[in-house]
Amino acid sequence: MSSELEALRQETEQLKNQIREARKAAADTTLNQAAVNVEQVGRIQMRTRRTLRGHLAKIYAMHWASDSRNLVSASQDGKLIVWDGYTTNKVHAIPLRSSWVMTCAYAPSGSYVACGGLDNICSIYSLKTREGNVRVSRELPGHTGYLSCCRFLDDNQIVTSSGDMSCALWDIETGQQTTAFTGHTGDVMSLSLSPDMRTFVSGACDASAKLWDIRDGMCKQTFSGHESDINAITYFPNGYAFATGSDDATCRLFDIRADQEIGMYSHDNIICGITSVAFSKSGRLLLGGYDDFNCNVWDVLRQERAGVLAGHDNRVSCLGVTEDGMAVATGSWDSFLRIWN
């Protein structure tokens, strides 16, 4: 048995090397070569326009509504808060059954928010009830590990990622898991839906990113390169690439059609992990939230740092860019959210 395993291991290594060679042969240029004549973006200087105060403990997650005005945040204080980003008013403050929340999401329709964490359950809350109060409309149990990330496809479907090494697609009305996405060999930490909603990418503690077909439940591509856990992942606006942030202190850009890593964003002075990543609307800038309390802004094409958003007094745990591209929100363990532009 062990000799068979050894032979299979060697065969896999050989196949991996063949794939590496094939990828190298296909890589006829580099991002640096392609971007050599691109204008520099100049120093990106953003100011904090709003500070959202109200959480009493570390903020773990945030997500903008599709109206680019409201946002939802989740904190260790056991509250989910829906904010009006223009006025800084709290639209809803939702007490959670479990305060160990790690992720939250806003439905595209604006009618629902979802959250989950160490309770292994994705809870869906209806914001548009007749009585005007917010209530749990559905709980989705089924994962055997913590819920690390969730994103709505529509009001009746949500995709989740979990510490049980899997992702899942749920039918919210029936409360059933319709598809399980298995293949990662470490906790899945983050997911991002493609702009056309047909695929999603996931990043995990096996240091790999995977691309999944939502309809047939299959892993279509696997991307390696990181040297440690991938904490965050986000699609490029056109859907042909995605970026990741890792504990190895780098963000990386992967091209889906080229099937490989094409860019890396790092600096000798940055030695801490990345918690969150987001692209500007055009895709020219990549924002990363770091354990050292900063948010770095990278020029995607030239692979150089273009700015820093400094202002939090603790780890930046989450960030998001509005759909209209006009503002960035950062959330932190200092219990505050800041809106920049």
Curated annotation (Swiss-Prot):
Transmembrane segments: none annotated. Pfam families: WD40_Gbeta. The keyword Cytoplasm applies. SMART domains: WD40. Keywords: Calmodulin-binding, Cytoplasm, Repeat, Transducer, WD repeat. Its main location: cytoplasm. Guanine nucleotide-binding proteins (G proteins) are involved as a modulator or transducer in various transmembrane signaling systems. The beta and gamma chains are required for the GTPase activity, for replacement of GDP by GTP, and for G protein-effector interaction. This is Guanine nucleotide-binding protein subunit beta. It comes from Pinctada fucata (Akoya pearl oyster).
